[in-house]
Amino acid sequence: MMDSTFDGMKSIDIFKEDCKFHHIGLSVKSIDALFPNMKPVTDPIQRVKVAFINLQGTTIELLEPLDETSPIYNNLKNNNKLCHICFEVSNIDNAINNGKKKGFHVIQKPVPAVALGNRKICFLFHSDYHIVELLQR
Protein backbone atom coordinates (compact mmCIF):
# COMPACT_ATOMS: atom_id res chain seq x y z
CA MET A 1 0.00 0.00 0.00
CA MET A 2 1.32 3.42 -0.92
CA ASP A 3 1.64 6.13 1.68
CA SER A 4 -0.55 9.13 0.84
CA THR A 5 2.13 11.60 1.92
CA PHE A 6 5.25 12.54 0.03
CA ASP A 7 8.59 13.29 1.64
CA GLY A 8 9.64 16.83 0.90
CA MET A 9 6.24 17.98 -0.37
CA LYS A 10 6.07 21.75 -0.21
CA SER A 11 2.84 23.52 0.65
CA ILE A 12 2.22 26.73 -1.29
CA ASP A 13 -0.46 29.39 -0.89
CA ILE A 14 -0.74 31.47 -4.06
CA PHE A 15 -4.22 32.94 -3.90
CA LYS A 16 -4.83 32.98 -0.12
CA GLU A 17 -8.49 33.94 0.57
CA ASP A 18 -9.39 30.53 2.08
CA CYS A 19 -8.50 28.94 -1.26
CA LYS A 20 -9.87 25.40 -1.66
CA PHE A 21 -9.74 23.00 -4.60
CA HIS A 22 -13.13 22.89 -6.37
CA HIS A 23 -12.85 20.99 -9.68
CA ILE A 24 -10.87 20.09 -12.77
CA GLY A 25 -12.17 21.30 -16.15
CA LEU A 26 -11.96 18.95 -19.15
CA SER A 27 -12.70 19.72 -22.81
CA VAL A 28 -15.02 17.23 -24.52
CA LYS A 29 -16.45 17.11 -28.03
CA SER A 30 -19.90 16.02 -26.86
CA ILE A 31 -21.30 15.65 -23.36
CA ASP A 32 -24.29 13.79 -24.83
CA ALA A 33 -22.01 11.20 -26.46
CA LEU A 34 -20.27 10.54 -23.13
CA PHE A 35 -23.35 10.69 -20.90
CA PRO A 36 -26.58 10.43 -22.94
CA ASN A 37 -28.91 10.94 -19.96
CA MET A 38 -27.12 13.99 -18.59
CA LYS A 39 -28.64 17.42 -19.12
CA PRO A 40 -25.82 19.94 -19.62
CA VAL A 41 -26.29 23.61 -18.80
CA THR A 42 -25.69 26.08 -21.62
CA ASP A 43 -23.56 29.06 -20.62
CA PRO A 44 -23.77 31.73 -23.34
CA ILE A 45 -21.23 33.92 -21.50
CA GLN A 46 -18.53 31.24 -21.65
CA ARG A 47 -19.89 29.85 -24.97
CA VAL A 48 -19.96 26.29 -23.61
CA LYS A 49 -22.24 23.51 -22.47
CA VAL A 50 -21.32 22.41 -18.95
CA ALA A 51 -21.94 19.28 -16.90
CA PHE A 52 -20.36 17.98 -13.72
CA ILE A 53 -19.45 14.42 -12.77
CA ASN A 54 -18.00 12.97 -9.59
CA LEU A 55 -15.00 10.74 -10.22
CA GLN A 56 -14.09 8.97 -6.99
CA GLY A 57 -14.63 12.08 -4.87
CA THR A 58 -13.18 14.56 -7.37
CA THR A 59 -15.47 16.93 -9.25
CA ILE A 60 -14.85 17.04 -13.00
CA GLU A 61 -16.38 19.81 -15.10
CA LEU A 62 -17.08 18.70 -18.66
CA LEU A 63 -16.91 21.58 -21.15
CA GLU A 64 -18.32 21.29 -24.65
CA PRO A 65 -17.90 24.21 -27.07
CA LEU A 66 -21.11 25.82 -28.35
CA ASP A 67 -19.38 26.77 -31.61
CA GLU A 68 -16.01 27.73 -33.09
CA THR A 69 -15.92 30.99 -31.07
CA SER A 70 -15.73 29.06 -27.80
CA PRO A 71 -12.33 28.97 -26.09
CA ILE A 72 -12.89 25.23 -25.64
CA TYR A 73 -13.05 24.74 -29.41
CA ASN A 74 -9.34 25.54 -29.78
CA ASN A 75 -8.48 23.21 -26.89
CA LEU A 76 -10.11 20.32 -28.72
CA LYS A 77 -8.63 21.37 -32.07
CA ASN A 78 -5.17 21.19 -30.46
CA ASN A 79 -6.07 17.93 -28.67
CA ASN A 80 -5.86 19.57 -25.23
CA LYS A 81 -8.33 17.88 -22.91
CA LEU A 82 -7.27 19.38 -19.59
CA CYS A 83 -8.60 22.95 -19.50
CA HIS A 84 -8.04 24.20 -16.00
CA ILE A 85 -7.98 23.55 -12.30
CA CYS A 86 -10.48 25.54 -10.24
CA PHE A 87 -10.12 26.94 -6.75
CA GLU A 88 -12.95 28.38 -4.70
CA VAL A 89 -12.04 31.60 -2.88
CA SER A 90 -13.79 33.86 -0.39
CA ASN A 91 -12.85 37.09 -2.21
CA ILE A 92 -12.16 36.76 -5.93
CA ASP A 93 -10.71 40.27 -6.32
CA ASN A 94 -8.19 39.75 -3.51
CA ALA A 95 -7.31 36.31 -4.89
CA ILE A 96 -6.67 37.84 -8.33
CA ASN A 97 -4.36 40.45 -6.80
CA ASN A 98 -2.51 37.75 -4.84
CA GLY A 99 -2.13 35.72 -8.03
CA LYS A 100 -0.75 38.73 -9.92
CA LYS A 101 1.93 39.10 -7.23
CA LYS A 102 2.97 35.50 -8.00
CA GLY A 103 3.17 36.00 -11.78
CA PHE A 104 -0.38 35.10 -12.85
CA HIS A 105 -2.04 37.12 -15.62
CA VAL A 106 -5.80 37.59 -15.90
CA ILE A 107 -7.07 36.13 -19.17
CA GLN A 108 -10.75 36.58 -18.32
CA LYS A 109 -12.08 39.09 -15.82
CA PRO A 110 -14.77 37.98 -13.33
CA VAL A 111 -18.11 37.11 -14.93
CA PRO A 112 -21.16 35.15 -13.74
CA ALA A 113 -21.02 31.38 -14.29
CA VAL A 114 -24.44 30.02 -15.27
CA ALA A 115 -23.58 26.42 -14.29
CA LEU A 116 -22.37 27.54 -10.86
CA GLY A 117 -25.39 29.54 -9.71
CA ASN A 118 -24.14 32.75 -11.35
CA ARG A 119 -21.26 32.97 -8.91
CA LYS A 120 -18.33 34.95 -10.29
CA ILE A 121 -15.49 33.14 -12.02
CA CYS A 122 -12.32 34.36 -13.66
CA PHE A 123 -9.40 32.72 -15.42
CA LEU A 124 -5.71 33.36 -14.86
CA PHE A 125 -2.64 32.06 -16.65
CA HIS A 126 0.87 31.31 -15.43
CA SER A 127 3.56 29.76 -17.61
CA ASP A 128 4.32 27.12 -14.94
CA TYR A 129 0.80 26.42 -13.64
CA HIS A 130 -1.14 26.90 -16.91
CA ILE A 131 -4.80 28.01 -16.58
CA VAL A 132 -6.43 28.42 -13.19
CA GLU A 133 -10.08 29.27 -12.63
CA LEU A 134 -11.09 31.15 -9.50
CA LEU A 135 -14.65 30.74 -8.21
CA GLN A 136 -16.22 33.20 -5.76
CA ARG A 137 -17.55 31.31 -2.73
What is each stretch, according to the model?
Residues I45-K49, A115-R119:
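Short acidic/glycine-enriched loop/turn segments that link adjacent beta-strands
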Residues M1-T42, N54-I107, N118-R119, L124-R137:
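Glyoxalase I/VOC metalloenzyme domain signal
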